[in-house]
């Protein structure tokens, strides 16, 4: 109790409400109730080709983000409020939670797709691993001293090494072409694998080894290539990414047009428009601070500005269509100003 000349003055001190009480009041707030209805409407939308689960999650996150931005603008324009700050905090936590769920779902999707691609690639790798040891075993069984003393060992080794190199590279190319034909046609078609003629003195021995090599390759390739005729090639998964979907030309623009036609919200952000109005008033009143403007007056100015801009763009698009164009250009807007806005400097 304080005493002054005019008499005693009583000052009352109130305890701030508890967090639980504030939460109960926030749950019954009209903005929160309207947002809950909007959220349920998004969740109850049926599945279609233009709306998948990932798009629905992104739409929910955007709704949280827009609501938080709206409250932050109110916090900037008006006095600080504990209830509003608590609502911003709660909705921010909810938005982060939905973003975490969305990221986990995306990671799980790509993990499953990689596992599926790996399982499709496994039969091809196993068949290649089976063929490699057979080739190595056949190479180790070749007897390079078959001709005895009449054959030069060094000369035979060099010739055999170059011949084996060209033959192995040719076999690799033919094996790849045969694998491609397996995936397109079930019937095996082999190219002629006749070796190049050799004009050295050991021609008969080389031809014999090449024939044996070709027969072994035919047997190994036929035995390993018959079962996996029904396998799928790697990279041909039917699962596609949802957020990289291709749209037809103009589809996104039409969706945005329908969205803005259904909404009754302002298209210009409130805070920048208020700052612009204050700046214009300050310039016109020679930087004096003796002015006030009501919130409904600002709303009326914003509605008038949006109506004027919409009408101007409608006329400019009509001029653009008259010129047999679909792209709006600055000359269309300038022509509209000359025709319809002569008094506007």
From Swiss-Prot:
One of its GO terms (cellular component) is nucleosome. Residues 263-340 are annotated as: H3-like. Disulfide bonds: none annotated. GO terms for molecular function: DNA binding; protein heterodimerization activity; structural constituent of chromatin. The record marks 128-129 as: Cleavage. It comes from the Eukaryota. Cleaved at the onset of meiotic anaphase I, likely by separase sep-1. It is found in: Nucleus; Chromosome. Residues 117-246 are annotated as: Disordered. The keyword Nucleus applies. Belongs to the histone H3 family. This is Histone H3-like centromeric protein cpar-1.
